[in-house]
């Protein structure tokens, strides 16, 4: 990874502010209704101004439709410069149906404190909310918005909190680029990709909040500047900071940069369902001390644990060493000398001769693979395991009871007999095994 690019030269801001402060070219509006000026364009109403700046104040509610001379028109756009310089504007309600927010539409609305972008918005112009210094909260719900160009619509604003709606799938290029006031990002559960430089130079970020850990694991980032966690360094799941990370079993791949710079992460457990781990997935996690990799992983990206200087315990229960796409777990060979690799006893020789894995100074064959459902440890799941669970329930454990064993589940441990992972051994676990047996035949 390269060093973060520097902030735009300050003279650009100065020149931009001078140019944008020049009077807007006066133009006629078609009509006014309830204090809002409109132009008519191809049968649609476009919110505009009266030819002067600072023509709106207080709370403005833009309607979904407006009637003029007996004809009702859908309101579909906020035009260029529409609210520019309206320093007395406090709140604006943008309705569903608005598809375009124009160039510098809210430039220098210094009293505006919050804004919600509706799902229908497909285009937001440069500088749309620039220099809105009192703007603190942005709720972004646009589900099909095109990528932004630099400078972004929100540049030089005072936004501190961004909430991404649950129906948003993509966050555009340059979305919050250089938004130094930003401290918190709350991510919607449907985001699948984040564009280039979306959170670049957001140096004030302190936390990222998510609702769905599985969804977070699979977000496609253009690069590291797309992930707000790079600057925030703290990730919260439903309000609780993630420190002992257990990847959900529904996850089959972990994206590149997924947990980059998650500074309070201490342990990572990757289940058997995961088959691939992307580049730099856990890079620069300085508190990470232990990582357990399940037996399903076959492909690993470059420098997954790079700069995890305290990681001294790596367990990989994959029988065949996963193949790296470019380089190993670390960039600095010194990390291999400080960490111990734990593998299955029968796999030691394979890891000792595998590219990059062989760089570990110490490879121990002491890893234990506990197959959930294989209660008696014979590497098969069958009727005998059902009987073992019954014995645990009735007799309290002559077949293992509530013993705990290492596993790529449940914070790195599993209770023998607890097949469904609810921390109890009961008839529900029997049903899981029976259903597995019936389904495997």
Protein language model regions, located:
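Bacterial N-terminal signal peptides that target proteins for export
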Residues: 2-15
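Boundary at the C-terminal end of the N-terminal hydrophobic targeting segment
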Residues: 26-30
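Structural signature of tandem-repeat unit edges
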Residues: 35, 40-44, 55-77, 87-100, ...
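Consensus positions within tandem repeat domains that build extended binding/scaffold surfaces
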Residues: 79-82, 102-107, 125-130, 151-154, ...
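Short, aromatic/basic amphipathic alpha-helical patches
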Residues: 151-153, 175, 220-226, 326-333, ...
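A recurrent domain-boundary module in secreted/ectodomain proteins
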Residues: 179, 353-370
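Cellulosome-associated attachment modules in secreted, modular CAZymes
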Residues: 367-441
């Amino acid at each position: 990874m390269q060093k973060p690019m520097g902030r735009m030269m300050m003279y650009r801001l100065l020149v931009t502010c001078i140019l944008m402060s020049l009077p807007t070219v006066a133009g006629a509006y078609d009509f006014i209704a309830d204090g809002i000026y409109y132009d008519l364009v191809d049968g649609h109403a476009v919110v505009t101004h009266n030819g002067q700046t600072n023509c709106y104040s207080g709370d403005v509610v833009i309607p979904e439709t407006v009637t003029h001379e007996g004809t009702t028109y859908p309101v579909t756009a906020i035009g260029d410069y529409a609210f520019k310089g309206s320093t007395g504007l406090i709140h604006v309600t943008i309705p569903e149906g608005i598809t375009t927010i124009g160039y510098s539409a809210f430039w220098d609305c210094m009293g505006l404190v919050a804004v919600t972008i509706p799902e229908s918005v497909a285009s937001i112009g440069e500088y749309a909310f620039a220099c809105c210094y009192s703007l603190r909260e942005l709720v972004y719900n646009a589900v099909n918005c095109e990528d932004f160009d630099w400078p972004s619509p929100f540049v030089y604003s005072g936004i501190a909190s961004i909430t991404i709606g649950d129906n948003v799938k993509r966050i555009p290029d340059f979305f919050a680029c250089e938004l130094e006031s930003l401290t918190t990002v709350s991510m919607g559960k449907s985001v699948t990709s984040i564009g280039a430089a979306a959170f670049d130079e957001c140096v004030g970020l302190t936390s990222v909040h998510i609702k769905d850990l599985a969804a977070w694991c699979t977000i496609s980032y253009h690069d590291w500047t797309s992930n707000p966690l790079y600057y925030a360094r703290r990730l919260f799941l439903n309000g609780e900071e993630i420190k002992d990370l257990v990847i959900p079993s529904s996850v089959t791949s972990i994206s590149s940069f997924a947990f980059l710079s998650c500074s309070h992460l201490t342990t990572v457990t990757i289940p058997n369902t995961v088959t691939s781990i992307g580049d730099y997935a856990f890079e620069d996690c300085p508190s990470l001390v232990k990582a357990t990799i399940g037996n399903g992983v076959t492909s690993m990206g470059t420098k997954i644990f790079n700069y995890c200087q305290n990681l001294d315990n790596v367990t990989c229960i994959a029988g065949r060493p996963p193949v790296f796409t470019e380089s190993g777990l670390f960039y600095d060979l010194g990390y291999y000398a400080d960490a111990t690799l734990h593998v299955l006893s029968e796999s030691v020789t394979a890891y000792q001769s595998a590219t990059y894995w062989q760089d570990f100074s110490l490879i121990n064959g002491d890893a234990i693979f506990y197959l959930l459902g294989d209660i008696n440890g014979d590497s098969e799941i069958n009727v005998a395991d059902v009987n073992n669970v019954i014995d645990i329930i009735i007799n309290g454990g002559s077949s293992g009871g509530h013993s705990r064993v290492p596993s790529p589940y449940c914070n790195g441990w599993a209770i023998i007999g607890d097949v469904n992972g609810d921390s109890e051994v009961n008839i529900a676990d029997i049903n899981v095994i029976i259903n597995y047996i019936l389904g495997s035949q």
